[in-house]
């Protein structure tokens, strides 16, 4: 069942509903808002929720999910395990430095 704004509404009172379905209009407006600013102030979240017929919580969670999607999309450029390779390289450099220090100490 849908409410007046086109949002799927099928939860019993006091129970969490399943996955939220947003209308095209709501999704477009949320995306536009996200492009303008990926973080909302409480005041702006209230304005957006009233304008779109959503709860503040729905808007807040939509933005959290959208930021995670954006973060994942931007991390695709990096190869999997790139951080691990950097860490191994740093550890290798530390070992080389220790060996050089030991050689210098042994010379004396």
UniProtKB/Swiss-Prot annotation:
It is found in: Nucleus. Residues 73-108 are annotated as: Disordered. SUPFAM superfamilies: Homeodomain-like. The keyword Transcription applies. Predominantly spinal cord and kidney. GO terms for biological process: anterior/posterior pattern specification; negative regulation of transcription by RNA polymerase II; neuron differentiation; skeletal system morphogenesis. It comes from the Eukaryota. It holds the Pfam family Homeodomain. Residues 73-86 have a biased composition (Basic and acidic residues). Belongs to the Antp homeobox family. This is Homeobox protein Hox-C8. It comes from Rattus norvegicus. The gene is Hoxc8.
């Amino acid at each position: 069942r849908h409410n007046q704004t086109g949002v799927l509404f099928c939860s019993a009172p006091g129970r969490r509903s399943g996955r939220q379905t947003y209308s095209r209009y709501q999704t477009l407006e949320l995306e536009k808002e996200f492009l303008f600013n990926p973080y909302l102030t409480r005041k702006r979240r209230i304005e957006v929720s009233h304008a779109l017929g959503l709860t503040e919580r729905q808007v807040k969670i939509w933005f959290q999910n959208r930021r995670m999607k954006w973060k994942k999309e931007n991390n695709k450029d990096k190869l999997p395990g790139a951080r691990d390779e950097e860490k191994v390289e740093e550890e290798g450099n530390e070992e080389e430095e220790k060996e050089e220090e030991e050689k210098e100490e042994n010379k004396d």
